[in-house]
Amino acid sequence: MDRNARIAQAVERRRADILALSRRIHGTPELAFEEVRTSGLLRSLLESESFEVSAASEALPTSFRAVHALGPGGPRVTFTAEMDALPGLGHACGHNIIGTAGAFAAVVLKSVLTDGLPGTIEVLATPAEERGSGKVRLIQDGAFERSDVVLQIHPHMLDTVVCQALGRRTLVVEFFGRKAHAAAAPREGRNALDALVLFYHAAALPRTKLAPGTLFHGVIEAGGEAPNIIPDYARGRFSVRGDAMAKLDRLVDEVRRQANRAAAETGCRVEITEPGPGVTTFRRNRVLEEIFAGLFAERGRPEPAKVREFYGSTDLANVSWIVPTIEPLLKASDSPIHTEDFARDAAGPGGEKALLDGVFILAAAGARLLAEPALLERVRADFRAAPAEEKSPPA
């Protein structure tokens, strides 16, 4: 029996355990940085399978690493396991599938590969992908320094191995004015909400004229307490995105200019902060895409080389600039991510098929990269041969 057949057999043997873990995570969604129960479930699984589990970052208590050394030396294949859910929507991004797939891919791979083969299997539990960019902090703490390749799957509404992500920076824009009675002393006030609304209109309404590949969107989080009191404080949170980091940085500069203009025109003061690290565009690896395309076909998912017109952002993209990384998409639903329908489907038949296929695909790819040094060298060579403008991580 060849290796992939043994991996498929191992996935089938653990089918009930795989689905049960995903359902438990799906049933108790936890927000960014609060993934205590989910982290505990993944940790317990890997400890029970004789992985060595330790903290990955003191700053991120729900993160951890789980390691099994097959033999001395050799490459380290890292599976990332995302855990957090979305406010009000639960697992509408399918992190129950991502976390379960990463953990069980390592378990299956350990059961199939012979100890003594040079190399290490690792799971890195990564919190706060949805809000907080947890992997950026893990990068800063050196969590990926020993990884030779990083593998993760993502459920979606289509199949593709082509990794695309927009760079994103989050801006919190606060305006400070002066309170006054809105009817009795309107000229005594400085309306912070007026400033925020003026800024939002100036920055958002021309969005159809933004440079191709850039986006600006956000929400008003605070805007006053009563209609007869001129608000002295207003706050909005905005995402600025671009398909190239230079475009993103130019748009951020323009957004800042619009905020300062709005403050000047209303007599208010403005403060603009970035509450967390930004995320980058994705550095593709064509050799990893080739490996995964073959495995997609093996699981009955043909033509997985689609390039998307619209796509979002992820902190895994930052990882792709320091180590060869891939995040292929597996169709789990006919609905887009970040919707109630997708949250439902993440624990339905489509989501569970994506999960089982994902465990197989991750484990089979990891097996090849551990057992075929020449293949891993091709992956590294593709990483080193990035176009000149991609030689270093974007600022």
At which residue positions do the language-model features occur?
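Acidic/His- and Gly-rich active-site-bordering loop/insert found
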Residues: R3-G119
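Active-site oxyanion-binding pockets that recognize sulfate/phosphate
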Residues: N4, A8, T28, A32, ...
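Hydrophobic face of alpha-helices
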Residues: A8, L19-S22, S39-R43, G102, ...
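Histidine/acidic-residue-rich, glycine-tolerant segments that coordinate divalent metal ions
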Residues: T62-H68, D84-A92, N96-I97, A103-A105, ...
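Hydrophobic/aromatic beta-strand patches that form the interior of the parallel beta-sheet core
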Residues: V77, L124, V149-L151, P324-P328
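Non-cysteine beta-strand/loop elements that form the S-adenosyl-L-methionine
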Residues: T78-T80, F176, I326-A332
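Metal-dependent amide/peptide-bond hydrolase catalytic core
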Residues: V197-A395
